[in-house]
Amino acid sequence: MEKNKPLELALDLLKHSNIVRNNEYRFVTPDFGIVISFTHMESRLFRLGQPYRLKEGRIIRGLRGKARITINLIEYNIYPQTIATFLPGSIIELLEFTPDCDFQLIAADKDFLPLLRGDQLFESHTRQNLVMQVTDTEWKLSDAYFTLIWGTVQEVPFRREVVQHLLAALLHNIKYIRTEEANDTSRRFSHQEEIFWRFIALVNEFSKNERTVGFYADKLCLTPRYLNTLIRQVSHQTVMEWINQSVILEAKVLLKHSNLLVYQISDELHFPNPSFFCKFFKRMTGMTPQEYQKR
């Protein structure tokens, strides 16, 4: 694959690999895809410890085993009977998984859903609650949706409108589950935790350009000192540690999956000069940018 931009885990990857339809385990079009068993598909898309950017939104159902991942800096575990939704543009990194790990996946472009802009429907899922362990009843219902969508895509010709509406219904149902969780007082976030999640969203959005505590404090209408204290109390990390992690994540994506030179990546990430970027990268990772590229 030509390295001309940061690699996105996109439906295009499967399309360019001449994998358009596999009746046994997967079905893919330019703007919609479903995988009924990732293990049996024998995909080699993922490498441990390598960040990727998601082009389309994703729905994941954990079937067996366990996977440990990070989504936009935050670590999650995918267990059996887990449902996860990942927003378009998210950066995902697979940290580890058990040999028996298997899951199902639906990916859809933002323009695929007919009744509502697809990105709005995915965005309606709260950023701090991307992964849920669901009840037996909700798990069976999600299985019914996946089974119905899978059965529908086997029909010829492709029943696009039917799949669009089934997917919209599935996303709305997941939204209902999240709403119930949000109304559960035992799971409700504290005021400090709410600020933390707002801070993380801001870091993911602005860290390429803004790397001062004051910027994020202003956005949250707090003093820099109070923000630093609050973030440390909630996460056991400082504001700058979170910002630096976000910058490193973006740098890794650019180093591995673009044809940009190191000095161009330094400019892209708004470092004063390449030397400063290289020192920062080595301090954070223990290796130079060039060494990371060659791994």
Locate each region found by the language model.
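Short beta-strand His + acidic residue motifs that chelate non-heme Fe in jelly-roll/DSBH
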Residues: 68-70, 86, 92-97
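Short, Lys/Arg-enriched, Trp-marked, Pro/Gly-tolerant hinge/linker segments that flank
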Residues: 133, 156-161, 174-201, 205-220, ...
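Terminal helix-turn-helix DNA-binding modules in bacterial transcription factors
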Residues: 233-275, 294-295
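…primarily DNA-binding HTH/wHTH and HhH modules…
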Residues: 278-295
